[in-house]
């Protein structure tokens, strides 16, 4: 009897574990997004999407301060004046500290990328709008039998007809003038 209860419990536990494996419940989240009830906390989502800035800037500044401190101690061990050691420390710190920490640069780059992305999105919207207008104009032109579109051959034929008609009219004027004097 106890064997059947134990085996049934094990089957249920294995089945539950199989259902949980690979889902968000495996990681301790309580998201029911697929069912539309609730999703994970906003702080958790933001932490996943926006990782902390790179600590390279902080590490490099700490390393430079450590090296400057060692240089300062070496200068004091050489029995130099305090003025000389201060000048060395100041010169070293001015040359070694970066102008902007990489963490700040990465924030600026991400903002620039975001702004650049918005600019590209706006340009693409304008391009799609202009393309849609052009396609609409072309479709309207085809629907009316080609009217509304520029046709170079038809335009040159029209100009040729006008030039020939002007020539015929000019010849008629000149010819009719001679006949009147008769």
Curated annotation (Swiss-Prot):
Name of the gene: CCHa1
Induction: In the brain, rhythmic expression is regulated by the circadian clock. In midgut enteroendocrine cells, induced by a high protein diet.
Record function comment: Neuropeptide ligand for the CCHamide-1 receptor CCHa1-R. Neuromessenger mediating signaling between neuronal cells of the circadian clock network involved in regulation of sleep latency (the time required to fall asleep), amount of sleep and depth of sleep (arousability). Together with PDF, involved in regulating intensity and periodicity of daytime activity. In subsets of clock neurons modulates the rhythmic expression of PDP1 and PDF, and together with PDF modulates the rhythmic expression of circadian protein PER/period, but not TIM/timeless.
Localization in the cell: Secreted
Any GO BP: neuropeptide signaling pathway
Protein name: Neuropeptide CCHamide-1
Glycosylated residues, chain numbering: 174
Region (Disordered): 67-103, 133-154
Expressed in which tissues: Expressed in endocrine cells of the larval midgut (at protein level). In the brain, expressed in the optic lobes, lateral protocerebrum, subesophageal ganglion, and intermediate and superior medial protocerebrum (at protein level). Expressed in DN1a neurons but not in other clock neurons and expression follows a rhythmic pattern controlled by the circadian clock (at protein level). In the posterior midgut, expressed in enteroendocrine cells (at protein level). Low levels in larval brain with higher levels in larval and adult gut and adult brain.
Propeptide residue span(s): 39-182
Keyword Disulfide bond: yes
Modification Histidine amide occurs at: 35
UniProt GO cellular component terms: extracellular space
Species in which this protein is naturally found: Drosophila melanogaster
